[in-house]
């Protein structure tokens, strides 16, 4: 059952060195505040999992938190490369990082399989792709019923999943509004989970606009809930604040240079305090 903690205490308790960590949120609700807390606590040797790593993983990688990244499409959306990811993979700074790249479809299926407690996900995919030649976690199997050749990938079962959402209620249930990625599946697939939210309300069912088909992550599936106002900036939170498009453009120059990046992290993450 969900426990209400500060973000500092939630990360300290559930994100251990060497853990496999998934931070999800597609386009919006990207858990930047939680990612920054992981950096502040100098967590190390993490295996990071995410569909579209985005700036948050560029920052974690450049800060030395990651040893491995499992992902689908790594880039700065609408801008270009993730330069800290590239520097780690190509030149080993701040240290070498192993990568396993999948398709979006495979990653989504892998999270869904993990949430169901299955060992693998099966899909139609990778036809004509060269990814299987560089990722030994992509296999092909024959359907026992039709004989069709299908792709198979391991399910995603993180040690801890971290997501951001708009609201949680006092019972620990979480409401995700707007574009829904694999946040729910990531939480259900994980051994432990942290959910950061913009606010806590008494009862989600009493909130204006609540409807039975809303995406709810149940409190029994969540380990810790932490309030992190504007916790997904510079991405956006539907109904709360817009995306900071200017920062995504600025990040390209910040991340290109090691010294500029290090100075930015020191000023904006290490010395910023965060959502305590």
Which stretches of residues belong to each language-model region?
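Conserved alpha/beta enzyme-core scaffold
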Residues: 1-276
């Amino acid at each position: 059952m969900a426990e209400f903690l500060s973000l500092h205490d939630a990360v300290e308790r559930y994100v251990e060195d060497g853990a496999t960590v998934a931070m999800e949120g597609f386009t919006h609700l990207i858990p930047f505040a939680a990612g920054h807390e992981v950096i502040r606590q100098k967590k190390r040797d993490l295996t990071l999992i995410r569909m579209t790593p985005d700036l948050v993983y560029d920052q974690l990688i450049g800060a030395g938190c990651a040893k491995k990244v499992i992902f689908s499409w790594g880039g700065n959306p609408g801008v270009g490369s993730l330069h800290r990811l590239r520097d780690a993979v190509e030149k080993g700074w701040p240290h070498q990082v192993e990568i396993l790249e999948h398709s979006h479809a495979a990653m989504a299926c892998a999270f869904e399989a993990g949430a169901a407690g299955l060992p693998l996900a099966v899909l139609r995919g990778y036809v004509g792709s060269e990814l299987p030649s560089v990722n030994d976690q992509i296999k092909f199997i024959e359907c026992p019923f039709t004989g069709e050749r299908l792709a198979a990938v391991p399910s995603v079962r993180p040690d801890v999943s971290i997501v951001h959402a708009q609201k949680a209620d006092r019972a620990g249930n979480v409401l995700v509004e707007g574009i829904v990625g694999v946040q729910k599946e990531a939480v259900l697939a994980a051994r432990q989970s942290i959910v950061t939210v913009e606010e806590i309300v008494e009862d989600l069912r009493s909130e204006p606009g609540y409807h039975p088909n809303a995406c709810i992550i149940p409190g029994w599936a969540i380990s810790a809930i932490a309030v992190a106002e504007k916790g997904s900036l510079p991405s956006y939170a539907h109904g709360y604040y817009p995306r900071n498009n200017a920062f995504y453009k600025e990040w390209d120059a910040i991340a290109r240079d090691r010294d500029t990046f290090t100075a930015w992290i020191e000023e904006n993450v290490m010395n910023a305090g965060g959502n305590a």
